[in-house]
Amino acid sequence: MPRRRHGRLRWCVVTPFHASPRTRRLLPIAALTLASALALPGCEITDGPADTAPGPVSANSALGATDGLTVKGRAPKTGYERSAFGSAWLDTDRNGCGTRDDILAEQLDDVSRDSDGCKVLSGVLDPDPYTGGRVAFVRGRSKVDIDHLVALSDAWQKGAQKWSDSKRRAFANDPLNLVAADSSANRRKGDGDTATWLPPNKEYRCTYVAGQVAVKKKYGLWVTAAEKDAMTTVLKSCPDRKLPSGGNPTEAGSR
C-alpha cells in the first residue's frame, strides 16, 4: 500500500486479505496483518508536507504598495477640463524639448527628428505595449498616442481636483505616468482605471498595473474598492514585481 514520506509515495508489501464466508472471524487477523505491515521500516505513518503559507509581501513590490493605497469612492467629475493640468506637453525637465517628443524619442525605435533635434518625425513602436503589435509613427497622422497610465480625468476624481496647478502640471508631464501606445487601444481605454480596462496584451498587464500603483502612491491619489481589488488580482500573478520609481518632481513650472 502507498504511504507518503517527505512528499513522496513509498510502497509497502502487505499480504492480501481475501473475503470469504469466514470474513467476520478473520477480520481481527486482517487488522493484525495490516498493523504489522505498517510497523515495517519505511512504512511508518507520516503526514505529507504541510501547505506552505505565502511568504510576506515585500514593501518594495507593487503588490505590497497596493496595500497602502487609500480606498475611497470616486468623486464627481464636475469641473474637469484638460486645461486644469496645464498646456499639453510642457518642457518640465528643461531639456528644450516637450514631454511628448521626449517620450517618443525614448520609447520608439528607428527615430528620425527634424533639424532642431526635438520634434520626432517618425519611428516604430515595436512591440506596442497595449496590443503587442507593431505600430508605425509618422508625425501628423500618427497611430501612436502618449497615454497617461493614470488618466487625467481619473486623477481628477480621486484627489487631483484639490491639488495646486503646479502639481497637476507635473502629473500630466511625469514620465513615470506616460507610455507610447497604439492610439486605438488607448482610446478604448478612455479614462478607465484598472477595474474597467486592462491592456489586451496580457504580458504587459503586470507592468501596466505596477505603473499605475507607483503613480498613485507618488501623488497620493486614492483608489476605489473595485480598482484595488483589480490591481491586487493582477499583481498576485507577479508578486515580486518591483514598484517603478523615478520620473519628475511633483511640482512643475508653467512652461
Where do the language-model regions lie?
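Acidic, glycine-anchored loop motifs typical of Ca2+
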Residues: 94-98
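N-terminal low-complexity, Pro/Thr/Ser-rich intrinsically disordered segments
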Residues: 49-84
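Acidic, aromatic-lined catalytic clefts of primarily extracellular/periplasmic carbohydrate-active enzymes
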Residues: 100-149
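Bacterial signal peptide processing site
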Residues: 44-47
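Domain-level detector of nuclease and nuclease-like folds
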Residues: 129-255
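C-terminal motif of bacterial Sec signal peptides marking the signal peptidase cleavage site
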Residues: 40-42
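Bacterial N-terminal signal peptides that target proteins for export
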Residues: 4-13, 17-30
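Acidic, divalent-cation-chelating loop motifs in proteins
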Residues: 89-93
